Amino acid sequence: MGNKQTIFTDEQLDAYQDCTFFTRKEILRLHGRYHELAPHLVPMDYTNDPDVKVPLALIVNMPELKENPFRNRIVESFSEDGQGNLSFNDFVDMFSVLSEMAPRELKAIYAFKIYDFNVDNYICKEDLEKTLNKLTKEELTPEEVNLVCEKAIEEADLDGDNKLSFADFENMISRAPDFLSTFHIRI
């Protein structure tokens, strides 16, 4: 007794449990991972809600992200500051949405944000080109990329505006059986 270090208050842990798909133990493990990224920045005591953000450059090098061609976009999509720097809340949100427990609808919202490179709330041909080039490590010719992107828009664009709205995107991924199994990260 007396030797136990308090990282979060019971109220904080309850709040994290209420708004994520994690148990108390998993939240504490996430804090450990967050602390490991920047031990000089991240305190072990979060009972006073410190205003700390771990830089994008440290987060994208986590083993769970470093091989993902969309790592920067993933982190930026969860960053409150829009620069890719993550507070602990942002970090927990990212892992919660990418957990196996998150529903398809929630994953779809963030997948759309990740693929919307120009942040105009549509996935246009240029967004698809960037996505395809990242997925294929730029091994396709410009003509092949163009053909695939045009075909994707033709098949998924329900209202004929030559870009994918969120509704178009959601309809498209509802027909992709592997979406849920590929859009996750284990902690």
Curated annotation (Swiss-Prot):
> Domain of life, per the record?
Eukaryota
Going by the UniProt record, its keywords in alphabetical order are: Calcium, Cell membrane, Cell projection, Cilium, Cytoplasm, Magnesium, Membrane, Metal-binding, Repeat
- Protein name per its UniProtKB record: Calcium and integrin-binding family member 2
Its main localization is cytoplasm
Record's keyword annotation contains Signal: no
Q: Which Pfam families match?
A: EF-hand_7 (PF13499)
Cite a single GO BP annotation: mechanosensory behavior
Q: Which organism is it from?
A: Danio rerio
Q: What is the lineage of its organism?
A: Eukaryota, Metazoa, Chordata, Craniata, Vertebrata
Q: Name one GO molecular function term.
A: calcium ion binding
Q: What does this protein do?
A: Calcium- and integrin-binding protein. Plays a role in intracellular calcium homeostasis. Critical for proper photoreceptor cell maintenance and function. Essential for development, maintenance and function of mechanosensory hair cells.
Gene designation per UniProt = cib2
Query: Would you tell me the Gene Ontology cellular component terms?
Result: cell periphery; cytoplasm; photoreceptor inner segment; photoreceptor outer segment; sarcolemma; stereocilium
